[in-house]
Regions:
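Acidic, Gly/Ser/Thr-rich repeat motifs that build Ca2+-stabilized beta-propeller blades
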Residues: 21-167, 216-219, 224-232, 282-316
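Hydrophobic residues within membrane-embedded alpha helices
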Residues: 9-12, 32
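Bacterial N-terminal signal peptides that target proteins for export
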Residues: 1-9
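Beta-propeller domain segments
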Residues: 81-83, 91-93, 164-316
């Protein structure tokens, strides 16, 4: 396994990358500078970039200039909350749909939770805005929003919502939002083969549960499986391959401990629950996730890249 040290902004495109001494030679190019907390980005067909700033700005970087998109929804940018991920519909060229995740109260007076919205852009303004999922209830705990978005080869929409800092209530209860991976049709409707569709009390959009704070997500282009990474507490960051209806164990099983050094569980594996395919102790604070598919890097094709916020390297 190789480690490429970097000053991390967001995975590859916004990185100031340096290399350790290995046979491969890498260089970097600063694509966009003077960003505060960029959380997600997508390239458009003209190679311009849509970038989310956590503070609540959507930036269109085109021809070397930053244009702020107008008409954004209500966004509560506090601590870990704000404007988070962004993803294009697989048929964006034909339908123009763009998807974002963000923390909002949905006009409630108290707290916030993760929302998923789709919209189009016309004349640098959001139009046709549709909230296709809003996690409930709102919480005043402004952390663990999850919020990564991904489409699969069948145009199913997947997204994550973290446990919202309430590990003892949310992750193991399928009748509550939080600590879950969700699956919807692109318009927000619930697939009839979702795993808990016949459970009267369950949140029907749930696809898997028992997660802490999944903030990396990618479809493996070779196996078509959904891969995620999630933040552990003190130790216990994980990589998981998502299976329909599966329980990933949080907080009943973990390789991590409380931030103060005490244990909250003595178990790292439980029969009937999924174990991570990889975990980190100590934590690396994973951020960003992408499979290498380009023939430009033949020796790395198929490898997975994950950035570390703590140690400031790119993990392969």
């Amino acid at each position: 396994m190789k480690y490429f040290f970097l000053r991390f902004l967001f995975l590859i495109s916004f990185s100031f990358l340096t290399t350790t001494i290995y046979s491969d030679n890498y260089s970097y190019k600063v694509v966009v500078s003077e960003l505060e907390v960029p959380w997600g980005f997508v390239f458009l067909e003209d190679n311009s970039i849509l970038i989310t700033e956590r503070k609540g700005e959507l930036i269109h970087f085109v021809n070397g200039k930053k244009i702020k998109i107008k008409g954004l929804p209500e966004i509560i940018a506090k601590n870990q909350g704000g404007l988070l991920d962004i993803e294009l519909h697989p048929e964006y060229k034909n339908n123009g749909w763009i998807y974002i995740s963000y923390s909002s109260s949905n006009e409630s007076k108290s707290g916030s939770n993760t929302s998923i919205m789709r919209f189009k852009i016309e004349k640098n303004t959001m139009i046709e805005k549709e909230i296709i999922y809003k996690a409930l209830p709102n919480s005043k705990r402004d952390r663990h929003y999850g919020s990564r978005i991904e489409f699969d080869q069948n145009n199913f929409l997947y997204f994550s919502i973290g446990d919202r800092g309430n590990r003892d209530v949310n992750p193991q209860n399928i009748d509550r939002d939080g600590g879950k991976i969700y699956r919807l049709y692109d318009d927000g409707q619930i697939p009839i083969d979702n795993p808990f569709i016949t459970n009267r009390s369950a949140k029907k959009a749930i696809y898997s549960y028992g997660h802490r704070n999944p903030q990396g997500m990618a479809i493996n282009p070779f196996t078509k499986e959904l891969w995620i990474h999630e933040h552990g507490p003190r130790g216990g960051d994980e990589i998981n391959i998502i299976k329909k209806g599966a329980n990933y164990g949080w907080p009943l099983a973990s390789f991590g401990i409380n931030y103060i050094g005490t244990k909250f569980t003595n178990k790292t594996s439980i029969s009937g629950m999924e174990d991570p395919i990889h975990y980190w102790v100590p934590s690396i604070a994973p951020s960003g996730m992408a499979f290498i598919t380009s023939d430009i890097y033949p020796n790395s094709k198929g490898d997975l890249l994950i950035g570390s916020l703590i140690f400031q390297y790119l993990h392969k």
